[in-house]
Amino acid sequence: MKLYYIDQRKLFSFMQPVEVWDEQGNVRYRLKSECTVGYHLHLLTPYDEEVASIRQNLLTMVPKFIVKVNGKELAVSLKHPLNDSEYCTVTDLNWKTEGFLKYRTYQITAEDQQIAKVQMVEFSKGEKDALYEALKKIAHVPESALSQGNCCEIDFSDDLNEAEILAVVMAIEAVLCIDSSSSSA
């Protein structure tokens, strides 16, 4: 199964919801921001039922988010090893990202098992126009967002944990947004 969302580097810097849709163009989830100190995000179904919350932990040296999903509390944090590329870890599940986070091309793995793969999806001009027309109706995506070729695809290895995996991916996006704004400051 695959889900899609628009990666807007400052994804959570505004109060407009981010919509996640499936391969048929149906909105499956909506991510809404709450106006608080630090980020507080809610992952909702199209019927506004909360399936997860993602809250920034402000008292840390590195970007860290707490994900509450399926009765569990998971910590998603960014690691910056000195001689290697950065990666994220998810406590309690022993998940780790492998790949290129800042280019949105990575896998989430547990030991040697792939949980999900996230990658940028490039569209041709005709595909972008058709996609924009479809998304304009369902996802309220500005055309400028698509012109950058910044649609991300999440390919799930396990459909049973869809909300959990999606909440972790959105927490990773939030970690990357915090990290890029702090490193550019």
Positions of PLM-derived features:
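A low-complexity, Ser/Thr/Gly/Pro-enriched, surface-exposed linker/loop concept
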Residues: 51-61, 68
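Low-complexity or membrane-interfacial segments used for flexible interactions
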Residues: 1-40, 46-49, 62, 73-75, ...
